[in-house]
Amino acid sequence: MNRPLIVASLPVTSPGDISRVKDIDADLVELRLDYSREFPRPQDLLPYRDRILVTLRDREEGGQGNFTDNFKETFLNELMKLGILYDVEASFLSRRRVQFREKVVSAHYFHRLPSREEVDCLFSTYREAFTVKIAVSNLPGYREILSYISTKPGSTFMPMSPDPLERLAISLLGSRLLYTYVDSPTATGQLHYLEAKRILNCLF
């Protein structure tokens, strides 16, 4: 059983929020820039490059963002040039050219579960990613498909379940990342990062 990396999700509403990264004791801090009212410049993130995961989550994927494809493609490509880790949706990659090697490629299933064939295709297409992250709603059969995803090397997987302990327990099947929150949950069922860290410290 491998310990997942703790990702502490931090909504960034203004560039000043970014300085909080240095005080958050997690493996990675996810900067949720889709909450931003005043967008930071990519260069502003450089001092925290080794500690952050940048996410611009579109509304259709469960986020707060309303970005044009051109803006998002340009911003992510700037992050790539600076060597900053980011999350990019598989749905976005299907229509735009963005580097995904050693990045997080994500897919979210709100109203249905993916088939095994879809899962296989995601991991084959994005095999060079740092991790392929799949989140599924707790529909009938969700535990079975999460168990299948857990067999994929380097995968990240989670249920959109209101039960934080189930989310944590499922991550112990071998998920590379465990998403948590800093101030308030950015997704259903997240634990506070310090609570997740306390539990994992007892187990590992």
From Swiss-Prot:
Active site: 108 (proton donor/acceptor), 133 (schiff-base intermediate with substrate)
Enzyme nomenclature, EC number: 4.2.1.10
Enzyme class: lyase
Catalysed reaction equations from the record: 3-dehydroquinate = 3-dehydroshikimate + H2O
A molecular-function term among this protein's GO annotations: 3-dehydroquinate dehydratase activity
Binding residues for 3-dehydroquinate: 9, 30-32, 57, 167, 186, 190
GO BP field: 3,4-dihydroxybenzoate biosynthetic process; amino acid biosynthetic process; aromatic amino acid family biosynthetic process; chorismate biosynthetic process
Family assignment from sequence similarity: Belongs to the type-I 3-dehydroquinase family.
Keywords tagged on the record: Amino-acid biosynthesis, Aromatic amino acid biosynthesis, Lyase, Schiff base
UniProt name for this protein: 3-dehydroquinate dehydratase
NCBIfam families (alphabetical): PRK13576.1 (NF010091)
Function according to Swiss-Prot or TrEMBL: Involved in the third step of the chorismate pathway, which leads to the biosynthesis of aromatic amino acids. Catalyzes the cis-dehydration of 3-dehydroquinate (DHQ) and introduces the first double bond of the aromatic ring to yield 3-dehydroshikimate.
Pathway stated in the Swiss-Prot or TrEMBL entry: Metabolic intermediate biosynthesis; chorismate biosynthesis; chorismate from D-erythrose 4-phosphate and phosphoenolpyruvate: step 3/7
Description of how the protein assembles with itself and partners: Homodimer.
